[in-house]
A protein has these predicted regions:
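Catalytic glycan-binding domains that act on GlcNAc-containing polysaccharides
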Residues: 2-130
Length: 130
């Protein structure tokens, strides 16, 4: 279980275990905490592998087509491909932002260009609540 919630850490837990083995594998492959990947999936798609956002983001980790191309994702609705591609992208962002988790998560949500343009976390309500 991962402590998360709209008010911050500790207000609710993620109990969906369906993808735990895939998450653990991707976490080991990309040197990420499994809890981080699981929290992103919970926030992005609520564990719905068929989720599609208004912006066109797809799958468990809600990857937009341009990012899918960047990380080599062929089928965004395949949980294995999506979790590994989303985890790869998280690793890319963490490397780009020198391990700054807040900036990396904001970039995952709003796009890395928004972080650079805002000189930090952009003032979008969705990103601030992310």
């Amino acid at each position: 279980m991962v402590p998360i919630g709209p008010q911050g850490p500790g207000f609710s837990t993620i109990q969906n275990k369906r993808y735990d083995a895939l998450i653990a594998s991707a976490a080991a492959h990309y040197s990420l905490p499994a809890a981080l990947i699981k929290a992103v999936i919970a926030r992005e798609s609520a564990f719905n592998p068929k989720a599609v956002s208004k912006a066109g983001a797809q799958g468990l980790m809600q990857i937009i087509p341009a990012t899918a191309k960047e990380v080599g994702l062929k089928d965004p609705f395949d949980p294995v491909q999506n979790i590994f591609a989303g985890s790869r992208y998280l690793r890319i962002l963490l490397n780009r932002f020198d391990g700054n988790l807040m900036a990396s998560l904001a970039a995952y949500n709003a796009g890395p260009h928004q972080i650079k343009d805002a000189y930090g976390i952009p003032p979008f309500p969705e990103t601030l609540n992310y």
